[in-house]
Regions:
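Short, structured surface patches at the beginning of a domain
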Residues: 1-124
């Protein structure tokens, strides 16, 4: 079996979650899940909506570029809403990765591909 390269994304969405403990929680569950699946984490991305970075420095832009270049096969987050700032952004981002051959997985719900395809179809 070919080993799957995996990128891990950790994101805090509110000031309550901004603390280091929340990021470490996400990191811990993602690393454990990746290990259980036999995936090789190659990159970790940390993002806080309150960190003051311009939107064009969002880790999703770098992740998208990596997907376009087929640098990894799995994007893993702790929960689906960590992919974007609002639900429609989460679905659009996940659909982008799926179109570029990257499977989107969450620790809480597993493989999100089928759900993403359903949501994209209903948005048309």
């Amino acid at each position: 079996m070919k080993q799957k390269y995996t990128c891990l994304l950790y994101r805090t969405k509110t000031t309550e979650q901004k603390d280091q403990a929340e990021m470490e929680r996400q990191r811990g569950v993602c690393l454990q899940f990746a290990q259980e699946q036999g995936w090789l984490p190659i990159r970790e991305f940390w993002c806080s909506e309150e960190d003051g970075r311009p939107i064009n420095e969002d880790p999703l832009l770098e992740l998208r570029a990596g997907a376009e270049q087929a640098q990894f096969q799995i994007l893993l987050v702790s929960e689906f809403d960590r992919i974007g700032r609002v639900p429609v952004e989460c679905s659009a981002a996940a659909a982008f990765f799926e179109r570029h051959g990257v499977e989107v997985w969450t620790v809480t719900d597993g493989y999100m591909g089928k759900l993403v395809r359903l949501e994209v179809e209903t948005m048309k």
